């Protein structure tokens, strides 16, 4: 479990776009794309990366089942940069694009890029050596 508690608003990266969920929201079910979940309570915002999954919204609860999620404050930048480099190195060797190994490495690269983007965009006082270029 990454987060549990009462909040004022949850912003999710839904398949059809970013969506803000307030208390007493109408029920819905949505898939999640790679992106950021923002949880705000009393003007304090926590941000999490999410690498796909689903969200179920009920009037008084939001449940997220994610393939991967983490609080941006817990991201180890060095580790994310190393994972990104390893994935790029493997992909550069020319794995066939239709293999499970290729898809797994591609997903690892996307997760690393997401972590590094989260740090750049949202974490205060942290600099990454990642340039954002592929």
What are these regions (language model features)?
Residues 12-16, 24, 33-35, 49, ...:
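Generic hydrophobic/packing signal
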Residues 10, 29-32, 55, 109, ...:
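Residue-level detector of solvent-exposed, low-hydrophobicity positions
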Residues 1-47:
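A positional/architectural concept
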Residues 38, 44-52, 57-90:
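Negatively charged, Asp/Glu-rich surface segments that serve as flexible interaction/assembly modules
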Residues 6, 19-22, 57, 83, ...:
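Aromatic-enriched hydrophobic runs in primary sequence
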Residues 71-134:
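Acidic/glycine-rich phosphate/pyrophosphate-binding loops and surrounding catalytic core
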């Amino acid at each position: 479990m990454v987060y549990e508690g009462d909040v004022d608003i949850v912003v999710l990266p839904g398949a059809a776009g970013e969506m803000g969920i307030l208390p007493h929201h109408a029920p819905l079910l949505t898939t999640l794309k790679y992106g950021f979940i923002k949880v705000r309570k009393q003007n304090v915002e926590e941000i999490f990366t999410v690498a796909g999954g689903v969200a179920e919204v009920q009037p008084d609860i939001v449940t997220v089942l994610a393939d991967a999620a983490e609080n941006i404050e817990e991201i180890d930048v060095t580790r994310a940069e190393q994972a990104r480099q390893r994935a790029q190195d493997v992909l550069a060797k020319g794995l066939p694009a239709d293999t499970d190994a290729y898809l797994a490495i591609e997903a690892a690269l996307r997760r690393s890029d997401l972590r590094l983007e989260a740090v750049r965009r949202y974490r205060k006082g942290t600099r990454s050596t990642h340039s954002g270029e592929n």
